Curated annotation (Swiss-Prot):
Disulfide bonds: none annotated. One of its GO terms (cellular component) is autophagosome. The modification Phosphoserine is found at residues 202, 233. Residues 106-115 have a biased composition (Basic and acidic residues). The gene is Tbc1d12. GO terms for biological process: regulation of autophagosome assembly. It comes from Rattus norvegicus. RAB11A-binding protein that plays a role in neurite outgrowth. This is TBC1 domain family member 12. Disruption phenotype: Knock-down promotes neurite outgrowth in a RAB11A-dependent manner. Residues 1-57, 91-120, 156-229 are annotated as: Disordered. It holds the Pfam family RabGAP-TBC.
Amino acid sequence: MMGPEDAGACSGRNAELLPVPGPMGQDGKTVPATGGFSGGAVAAEPPGEAGEEEAPPPRQLLQRYLAAAAGPLQPGLGGVEAEAAAVPAARGSGMTNGDSGFLLLQDRRGPEEARRRRTCGRPCLAEPADEGVDGAGGLDDWAAPLEDPLRSCCLAAGDTDDPDPTATTSAGRDVGSAESSLGLPDARFGSRNTFEVSRRQSAGDLLPSAGQSAPLPAAEQGPGGTTVRARRSGGFADFFARNLFPKRTKELKSVVHSAPGWKLFGKVPPRENLQKTSKIIQQEYEARTGRTCKVPPQSSRRKNFEFEPLSTTALILEDRPSNLPAKSVEEALRHRQEYDEMVAEAKKREIKEAHKRKRIMKERFKQEESIASAMVIWINEILPNWEVMRSTRRVRELWWQGLPPSVRGKVWSLAVGNELNITPELYEIFLSRAKERWKSFSESSSDSDMEGLSVADREASLELIKLDISRTFPSLYIFQKGGPYHDVLHSILGAYTCYRPDVGYVQGMSFIAAVLILNLEEADAFIAFANLLNRPCQLAFFRVDHSMMLKYFATFEVFFEENLSKLFLHFKSYNLTPDIYLIDWIFTLYSKSLPLDLACRVWDVFCRDGEEFLFRTGLGILRLYEDILLQMDFIHIAQFLTKLPEDITSEKLFSCIAAIQMQNSTKKWTQVFASVTKDIKEGDKNNSPALKS
């Protein structure tokens, strides 16, 4: 079969186009070449018997050359392969597919002979054509296309690397005679391309072994055992119409898949370096130190909890650097033990934290599911029938569990009501007045201009509101200057100071207005804000009515002694009155002291139960931290209650609030408050410990 080297070798080689000197015969004279690539059919000439005349000089030339390069030449040169198969070609010193391919003349055989020649394993030369057969010429025409490629390739037998001693000896025996007769330089060729090696290795089982000859089909043998080439018309058009490289293409794929890369210029391309993971590094370290660590299966760990600790898995105990003295055996064992203890403690700590996170996530998911189910009930059943269902037991239980955020603002507005009959248009009127006042304050800010203003007007100044707004929920960064709700909060507070100049602005109002803004629209938030501050308890505190404030403190102490008598006596021993911690809680409605989500839940029940729940929540906080407060003195108690811990949860707080009984000898909050008010009017101050001070 012919390859790309074969086509390149014989392309353009024609005795008529390019004159080539004829080969030298035994007598040193130029022998005219015969034949050529004219495409004519060549009839095989039967080999002569012993004693007949010698072969023509060109045939001797080729016979000597091929004997040195690939074994003895077939005597017939017309497709006889028996003698060629008897002598194996020496590997490395024989011709490659690029050398012998151009010696193949046009295939004029039939399909059966073509298949036989493809499985032969050694190229067979066609015999020189007879005179007058398909335009074949004499000896010059036959030898010219063969001699020129041989001279251009400068082929000669090289050293052999075949392990077969017989082939090496037989090939080396004829090297000297071939070189002397041809006069060609010594050129050593191994495998001229990467495909030849694979062809020799992969097609070794197809080659006939030494001493055997490939039998020819009977149909292709002429009389007397000679080989006859079938006549076929056609020239180079038929030659190039065939598929020249089907076998080479298949072998190329096998070479590419079997080898890591092409070996170009004697260099093998480096392999791609794989990045090492932490597990590979740890395995290499354990293999180097001779210690194996049994890693627990990851699947079982993931079944227990979703959070897999990862920080300690990358800790690797390394030896000392080479420039430092090596560790002793005892020291290495001690360090190994300390390392294992450190890793074990870190694992326990991470597992504990992972369990805690998992528990928090479960509680959060459970709460979200309950809120989602409650939202459907509130939207579809309760809100459409608010006046009828607001006092039912089912609604009160849902209310206690917390309102869904999507309906919280609506429920707050309905629960607080609008006794003042404030409309959005009225809010716009008071807002415009507030803007005019701020403008006048900015234009005239001297002390002489401020002397004639009332106390409420002074507290309604722009500077005081700005200062308090900047301290409202500072962790959220939404009410400060430049935040999305800064202007809205500023407008509501300014409009309220114009609406209630008798109350004005008091520190703590900004937190109440901010919580309403987060759940309501601007106008609705102002309406709820004004009605909420109009309640008796809030009005007493924000107007700083000391007599009313003392009544609320006295009523609170009655229930404090009833529910937490031990803590009540502890506070009395330090002379700690409720005003130290209750003022901040009541002024801001716990929105400053508690986390925002927990404060909103307190607001939910406050809208249902009124001012009573504010003081009940205070008792619940004292009950929650009763054990801690009993161990503190006056200063630490005041500091602790002023700034409560941030990790307080709604479940714990509301469980403590539920344990507080707001009854004193069958008297409820309103009844106790009325009795305390009556006692104050009569001048009896002995019933309230707060009033004694």
